[in-house]
Amino acid sequence: YNIDVFKHTLLILSEGDFGAKNLSFYKENLQIKKLEENSIIKAFFINENTYLLISIGSEIELIDKSLKNIKKFNFSHSSLNDAVLNEDKSRLVAGFESGEVELFDLKNWKMLKNYDKMHKDNIYQVDFKNNVILSCGTDRRIGVVKNEEQNFLQKDFLIYTCALSPSGEFAVYSDNEAGVSEVFSTSDFKPVKTFNNENLMSEFIIFLNNKDFIVSGFGDSIMFRSIDE
């Protein structure tokens, strides 16, 4: 489901037996722990001894190294589809089936903002870099929150995946119908570059730096792309 890294230790959320979820840790050896809750869709390090679990049931939970509950929060929304943390793991951005995007303060454990002007329907993915928020979904929109302003690009195809560069200057999304990925500026929404996905159905995009990114999808191949190529 997802992987996180903290001080050379991997945290891995994966499928267990009979639909269960496992939380595994790998540094010099592999430790596998079974989660009690099967609805977890993502897991993150907060620090070396504290982890954050994200549930499709719109709940987040802070747990300790023994997987014991520290505290919970319920967003009281429809399904939570995706969530990401900022660089210092102090804030979380979540995207919901309702089309809302929410900003949550993990240190003070409270809601900060609700962004409801960008989407009308189900959000597939969100990203959060350098105080810029990106979202994409079934309403064929790419949403951007920058300097607290909500804006969106309207397209004519479903947008399953999107990502931000570390600076938040660039965003990229994939059009699987046309088989391309397009980079645009988050300041003026002008296109920067379009890439052919070479028959890859894009599912995830990760920026390595402000110019280079990886596109992966269904299958066993990944593509390395650069805005400078």
Residue ranges of predicted features:
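Structural recognition of the beta-propeller blade-terminating site
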Residues: 24-27, 63-64, 105, 146, ...
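A short beta-strand motif characteristic of beta-propeller blades
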Residues: 29-35, 68-74, 110-116, 148-154, ...
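Residue-level detector of Asp-centered blade-edge/turn motifs that repeat once per structural unit
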Residues: 5-7, 46-48, 87-88, 128-130, ...
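WD40/WD-repeat beta-propeller blade N-cap
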Residues: 35-40, 74-80, 116-123, 153-161, ...
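Hydrophobic beta-strand positions that form the internal "hydrophobic ladder"
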Residues: 10, 51-52, 92, 133, ...
